[in-house]
Swiss-Prot record:
KW Transferase (keyword) present: yes
Native source organism of the sequence: Bartonella tribocorum (strain CIP 105476 / IBS 506)
Protein name per UniProt: 3-methyl-2-oxobutanoate hydroxymethyltransferase
Domain of life: Bacteria
List of residues binding Mg(2+): 49, 88, 120
CDD domains in the record: KPHMT-like
Amino acid sequence: MSVHKMVKRITSSQIRARKGQQPIVSLTAYQAYTARIADPYCDILLVGDSVGMVVYGFETTLPVNLDMMILHGQAVVRGSQKALVVIDMPFGSYEESKEQAFLNASRILAQTGCGAVKLEGGVYMAETIDFLCKRGIPVMGHIGLTPQAVNRFGGFNTQGRKESDWQRIEDDAVVIENAGAFAIVLEGIVEPLAVKLTEKLSIPTIGIGASNQCDGQVLVMEDMLGYGAHVPKFVRRYGDLEQAMETAIKNYAEDVTSRAFPAEKEVYKLK
């Protein structure tokens, strides 16, 4: 009888307990194979609505729908064992009412097996977050630069450059914490404000374009691997995936056209 070692997934409660402890490692993932590779090293795998821009070529995250998020969420859950899988609620799936948010969030959890959902917004989303949390759905908040509000912001612009905006962003963070979120993403905000919020909140802050003093960091995996020409200021590239892919495909094409592939060892012979 074989014995399989069961790996326990990290929970949202465990992430919340990491406040002020060892920094939380998070990356986006959209496919089973990337989830499998990242899982041993990540505390959180975020199935972000950024999938729309990275995988589908949309200019924003707005065209992404619930079915797409569920499909990619299922793949990431299947491909991982340890990390907490958090799935973005896409634009239009939660803003109408707290009841709409619950129906769609519960569908995400039930159909994917993920551990939490993430939704964007500040004070105006507090009632919805509270409603979800009280009904057993762990929620990660997201403030600062919220990509689903790109049209309101007039682009992907850094938040908090004017100190007059600090109180509004701070109010957003505090209200989300009080509503029951287990963690909060701080995206595209000036570093002093990110540090202030991290010190003020009792839940972990996950930075992306914020500060290394946040309780954790998240990046789009393809950005840090070196895929794509555009490199945001806050991204550090740890590889050159695009160049590696191009070189491999070029070599393959050359081998096919020269009939060097397949070789003798790569074809089947009669016995």
